[in-house]
From Swiss-Prot:
The lineage of its organism: Bacteria, Bacillati, Cyanobacteriota, Cyanophyceae, Nostocales. Belongs to the class-II pyridoxal-phosphate-dependent aminotransferase family. Histidinol-phosphate aminotransferase subfamily. Pfam families: Aminotran_1_2. This is Histidinol-phosphate aminotransferase 1. Pathway: Amino-acid biosynthesis; L-histidine biosynthesis; L-histidine from 5-phospho-alpha-D-ribose 1-diphosphate: step 7/9. The gene is hisC1.
Length: 350
């Protein structure tokens, strides 16, 4: 067969997202870390207000309306923001702008596996450094590696732990390359590294509206960084990467902080209760600062439980990766969804 693809693409494995059942399928979906509550009513109203004139014209290329709204919420100038088709696109833009064969991308493991996929697309070198015991960041090893790009997810997935800002500040001050702090789950955490962006030119902070704002289907994320760093990223950004609908709705959603905070508070309360319930079943549950829990079943039968729950139309996440084979990641759902999950697990463990 004709070989159409670059050798690095032939060799790489595709990123595998959580299963997305067809719309209308009756399932308890706790596998993709989606927010169980609907988007802001104000955002939904903005969606209804969009008319054909918005769709006839090309969108504003830099997502200006969203940048202005996010600027006011975050307290940073709008020219410190780059907007993307989900935060994954911002990650991709960084990789495209900063790496090539012979340049190294570094990150601790386990973490978001898309970092590996994006790096392989560019045929850049990869160095994966294991987390130390109790999810302690291997700061010295990351500094010694000095990648062209270093990814740190905080809160991390699938573990849910947060990386101390002191560790991130140490990395930012010592690394010569770009430090990407992926804060996709920060809305459910107690602290952020946002201040580091204004202290260090080599830091870009990545956020999304998929989690805290319930807009995973809309696809909008953004990066916060020094304009000197963003200038290089804009060079490789697609010309019209943010559609007009996403920009408009996301601008309204990020402005409605009261609604977002109310949903986040409910998720955090449910996270606490679900942690307690799973521990009563004998699970080990790691402390989480995200909208999910990393758990270890009492009998080490993670894959079995994953498959049996799937038969009952309850979807959670099982990773066939080193160090995760005996663990399950569970998205925090509504209290009702969590009760159904716990009841099913209790029956399976009898």
């Amino acid at each position: 067969m004709t070989n159409y693809f670059r050798s690095n693409v032939e060799a790489m494995a595709s990123y595998v997202p959580g299963e997305q059942p067809p719309r209308g399928t009756q399932v308890i979906k706790l596998n993709s870390n989606e927010n169980p509550y609907p988007p802001s009513p104000a955002a939904l109203a903005a969606l209804q207000d969009i008319d054909g004139e918005w769709l006839r014209r090309y969108p504003e290329p830099l997502g200006g309306e969203f940048r202005e709204a996010a600027s006011k919420v975050l307290g940073v100038p709008s020219d410190w923001l780059i907007v993307g088709n989900g935060s994954d696109e911002i990650l991709s833009i960084v990789i495209r702008a900063c790496t090539e064969p012979g340049r190294k991308v570094v990150y601790p493991m386990p973490t978001y596996v898309l970092y590996r996929t994006l790096t392989q697309m560019q045929a850049a070198d990869i160095l994966e450094i294991p987390y130390q015991e109790n999810n302690v960041l291997p700061v010295a090893e990351l500094i010694a590696a000095d990648g062209a790009v270093t990814f740190i997810a905080s809160p991390n997935s699938p573990s849910g732990h947060i990386v101390p800002n002191d560790d991130l500040r140490k990395l930012a001050s010592e690394l010569s390359g770009v430090l990407v702090i992926d804060e996709a789950y920060v809305d459910f955490a107690e602290e952020s590294a946002l201040d580091l962006v204004q202290e260090y030119e080599n830091v870009i902070l990545i956020r999304t509206l998929s989690k805290g704002y319930s807009l995973a289907g809309l696809r909008l994320g953004f990066g916060v960084g020094n304009p000197k760093l963003l200038d290089g990223l804009f060079k490789v950004k697609d010309s019209y990467n943010i559609d007009a609908i996403a920009c408009k709705v996301a601008a309204v959603a990020i402005t409605d902080q009261a609604y977002k905070n109310s949903c986040v508070a409910k998720v955090k309360a449910s996270r606490t209760q679900l942690t307690k319930d799973l521990k009563q079943l004998g699970f080990h549950v790691w402390d989480s600062h995200g909208n999910f829990l990393l758990t270890k079943p009492p009998e080490g039968n993670a894959e079995y439980l994953y498959e049996k729950l799937k038969e009952q139309k309850i979807l959670i996440r099982y990773f066939q990766q080193p160090g995760l084979e005996d663990k399950l990641r569970i998205t925090v759902g509504t209290d009702e969804q969590n009760h159904i999950l716990v009841r099913a697990l209790r029956d399976l463990l009898r």
